[in-house]
A protein has these predicted regions:
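Cysteine-dependent deubiquitinase/ubiquitin-like isopeptidase catalytic cores across multiple families
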Residues: 1-238, 243-273
Length: 273
């Protein structure tokens, strides 16, 4: 790898701040996923757009990093050529692919909006080289890692960030790891699993099973936070313009409350602005 940055920590507040600095809109944020059991997803605003995973590297990861499909015409993918840049690359993988699928709209003239235009037509290798030479993203990474609460190590780091996004077609989970040649496609545990459950199943099968006694796993979910804002126990109020119709707004709250009769949306008692 050409040079080295200091590692990021798996802190949802810091990564949300970082993503907004780069150009993600303020209505999208990261949330901790506290378990790989299904109940943990009930604590996170839905629908979940993408996941980040920080995991400990195992002895066979050197061989595994050569995997991945080089064919990724419908996915924004880049290689990692800067040591410890995995957190930034995982974040960019999530952001760029959500924008590619029109699931989010970047802040106009933001870093990531300009980057998205600059890397069009480049293959994953050239995108990685482009990123490794870009001083603006290096400075942004350095700025956010200095705000972390963890003790920063200058030695060898044995944890790694990757991203997961949903497939455009079917219930396949797509893993994006900058060490690999391209995306990795994971079949879900069952065909009926929604994206969130399918990702947790992949994390259990493909990652935790290799280091079952290691506690250095962190899972972060990226989603709009309207379902939390709209929830009756929230002290916040929702914004005037939501990026989905009122029927979807009801659906989010029904899922959040699991049909509770006390839900203010279900009873029509929507808090005023």
């Amino acid at each position: 790898m050409t040079n080295s940055w200091l590692p990021l920590e798996a802190n949802p507040e810091l990564l949300t701040e970082y993503s907004r600095t780069l150009g993600l809109p303020a209505d999208v944020r990261f949330h901790d996923v506290l378990s790989v059991d299904a109940w943990a997803l009930e604590m996170v605003p839905n629908p979940i757009q993408a996941f980040l995973l920080l995991f400990p590297l195992s002895a066979d990861d050197t061989a595994c990093c050569k995997g991945g499909s080089a064919k990724c015409t419908d996915i924004v993918f880049m290689r990692q050529f800067v040591e410890n840049a995995c957190g930034t690359i995982a974040l960019l993988h999530a952001m760029l692919n959500l924008h590619e699928r029109r699931m989010v709209t970047f802040v106009q003239d933001s870093y990531v909006a300009r980057m998205y235009d600059s890397i069009q037509g480049l293959d994953p290798e050239k995108r990685g080289v482009w990123l490794s030479k870009d001083a603006e993203i290096a400075n942004a990474h350095a700025s956010i890692e200095s705000e972390g609460q963890s003790v920063v190590s200058n030695g060898e780091v044995d944890t790694h960030f990757i991203a997961f996004i949903p497939s455009r077609d079917g219930p396949v989970v797509i893993e994006l790891d900058g060490r690999k040649n391209g995306p990795v496609y994971h079949a879900p545990g069952t065909e009926s699993d929604p994206f969130g459950l399918a990702v947790l199943d992949v994390i259990k099968r493909e990652f935790i099973s290799k280091n079952p006694n290691d506690i250095r796993f962190s899972i972060l979910a990226l989603s709009y936070h309207y379902s939390t804002i709209l929830h009756p126990i929230s002290p916040q109020v929702y914004p005037n313009d939501l990026p989905f119709p009122i029927t979807e707004k009801f659906s989010l709250l029904c899922n959040r409350c699991l049909g509770s009769r006390s839900c203010k949306i279900l009873t029509g008692k929507i808090p005023k602005h």
